[in-house]
Amino acid sequence: MGESKCPVNFAGGGTRNKDWWPDQLRLNILRQHTSASNPLDADFDYAAAFNSLDYNALKKDLEALMTDSQDWWPADFGHYGGLFIRMAWHSAGTYRVFDGRGGAGQGQQRFAPLNSWPDNASLDKARRLLWPIKQKYGNKISWADLMILAGNVALESMGFKPFGFSGGRADTWEADESVYWGGEKTWFPKGNDVRYPNDDIYTRDLENPLAASHMGLIYVNPEGPNGNPDPKAAARDIRVTFGRMAMNDEETVALIAGGHSFGKTHGASSGDHCGPEPEAAGLEAQGLGWQSKYGSGSGRDAITSGLEVTWTKTPTRWSTNFLEYLFAFDWELTKSPAGANQWVAKNADAIIPDAFDPSKKHKPQMLTTDLALRYDPAYEKIARRFLENPDQFADAFARAWFKLTHRDMGPRARYVGPEVPSEVLIWQDPIPAVNHPLVDASDIASLKQAILNSGVDRSKFVSTAWAAASTFRGGDKRGGANGARIRLAPQRDWEVNNQPWLKESLAALEKIQSSFNGSRSDRKKISLADLIVLAGCAAVESAAQEAGHAVSVPFTPGRMDASQEETDVESFSHMEPVADGFRNYSTAPTRRRAEHYLVDKAQMLTLSAPEMTALVGGLRALNANYDGSAHGVFTSRPGYLTNDFFVNLLDMGTTWKPTDASGELYEGADRRTGSKKWTATRVDLVFGSHAELRAIAEVYGSSDGERKFVKDFVAAWNKVMNLDRFDLKRENVPARL
């Protein structure tokens, strides 16, 4: 019996729930990266381990590896630099701005699907080349950090000075299932029939939040859109994909021209000679894929992309040759040995070295996407400036490379290591350092009283604190309450925030802040960021106490206020939520329902299913819908922290029906009399409809459930309020996320 015909009568095999009900709301993404999958001790502190590393020795070992060519995978030109640059680039290059997912921060290139994407062919060999070094230094260096550092050392070993490097990327131990890579069922060179609404390569719009033109690519098709060798059309795709990775035109040109100053592509023959990708390969392959039967299968016979291009005559040294050749030659379309579209310089001498035969030379060659830098007017202007100003080119590439490889690391408070650059960059979302004594317990108590006596309904303080803190994204560690950017553009103008409660609560808090800070002789101050969180905590505490539950909501000062000048408006605009089910906000869904967006948001906030459930129920009880609506506010006591949401949702005396064909809004009526009782959204009703969520709701809706609910809500609230406090040691927030 062939392997594909093997029986599946084993644990976890057979037909699964998702096969029967493919549209079922899945909560698996809320159960990832926990201690159940992590082999390291619970108290393992990766940042501390990294700081104990002999960093210089590690870099020397990496530098030695660059020219230590192995027979089983020989180095092009005797140097692995190009391979390791590509590995680092592709590790970081999956990042996208709309949801903060992807990127290098978790070492996900080791796992499916990334380890088997067509665009990552042969990077399995790069990681195996690194294994002896990883084995030597053990847990002091994560795979996530090592892959990026190897790229930096590769640049250094070829004469380029990087901008810097930070460690701190803790490994995960399973494939991240939270990332939407696209709806396609095929990979590149197909694999784009869902992400684009039409086939017109000159007008099509890429689906959000994607940042690649095909399933299985990091960026775009190097042969041109859908294989069409049109540099101008390629420029359009490049601008979209690089833009969605947070790169502007200058950074894009710098990265392409700088990255292609090194190494080569591999297309000795057709990919038909290659075996299956790592995830489909046999056990004997030991995690390696694409094993080729063409010639030696490696070296001069290597097959990766199917393109066969060496860009410069100095592929192991930094130079401006790429830009020089780009503009010096006229280019004509040709084919690689594998039949792929590429370009060769007309009437040019053979000046490009062969990767393995020193007696051979080749004519300069380029990819369609390379020529986009010449034939797109905006890119051309930048590329010519870089050619005429090599120092500007080097600086731009160094900065863009640092941004590429560190974009998903979050604030500088997470940076560790001896090569962290001192310059503060706008894309790091800088926040001023604390420069004054912090408030103590007595101050906090008096400030709480001032907040509660301000005359502002406490639900508005809850809404404001949630609006500020819930911008956090676990993928790229951006957002959160620190910085008080809720008061700045663009956050204050987002539809979900541009409501009367924000203006009223901020005005009251600014008045309290001014009074407190102006009255002190001991230099103590409280930031608006701290005060926003404290107001939310005071409101929750008061709402619980008035409902009969004596609780203390934790609060730790130390946040500071960012300025508008320290806030990149365009960058933050990508973080505007499409939906926030926690406060019953949703724009028109596309191919997903509101409850799916809720789970998406919960995963960004690193919440578990019980935490998500407690927060939704509590925020409804506290009357914190973004627009003040009564949807899901299943209580006669709005503003009190009770379990009424769950009690009334689970009440069999209520029947529900949609208000229209969209199925977005529902009315609940008394089963006996038919009189209207409640209104609800899909997000509200899913806690009674979805079997797993209902099971949690039943715990909180039971006669003995309210005290536990209040306790769990306060814990989850505290977690969200502190998700961005990387300056604190937190036990209640998973450090490995």
Swiss-Prot record:
Catalytic residues in the record: 90 (proton acceptor)
GO cellular component entries: cytosol
Cross-linked residues, Tryptophyl-tyrosyl-methioninium (Tyr-Met) (with W-89): 219-245
Catalytic activity: H2O2 + AH2 = A + 2 H2O; 2 H2O2 = O2 + 2 H2O
EC numbers: 1.11.1.21
UniProt GO BP: cellular response to hydrogen peroxide; hydrogen peroxide catabolic process
Family matches, as PROSITE patterns: PEROXIDASE_1 (PS00435), PEROXIDASE_2 (PS00436), PEROXIDASE_4 (PS50873)
Residues at which heme b binds: 260
Gene Ontology molecular function terms on file: catalase activity; heme binding; metal ion binding
Entry's localization field: Cytoplasm
Site location (Transition state stabilizer): 86
UniProt KW keywords: Cytoplasm, Heme, Hydrogen peroxide, Iron, Metal-binding, Oxidoreductase, Peroxidase
Covalent link location (Tryptophyl-tyrosyl-methioninium (Trp-Tyr) (with M-245)): 89-219
InterPro entries, per database record: Catalase_peroxidase (IPR000763), Haem_peroxidase (IPR002016), Haem_peroxidase_sf (IPR010255), Peroxidases_AS (IPR019794), Peroxidases_heam-ligand_BS (IPR019793)
Free-text remark on how the cofactor is bound: Binds 1 heme b (iron(II)-protoporphyrin IX) group per monomer.
Job of this protein: Bifunctional enzyme with both catalase and broad-spectrum peroxidase activity.
Family: Belongs to the peroxidase family. Peroxidase/catalase subfamily.
Protein name: Catalase-peroxidase
Gene: katG
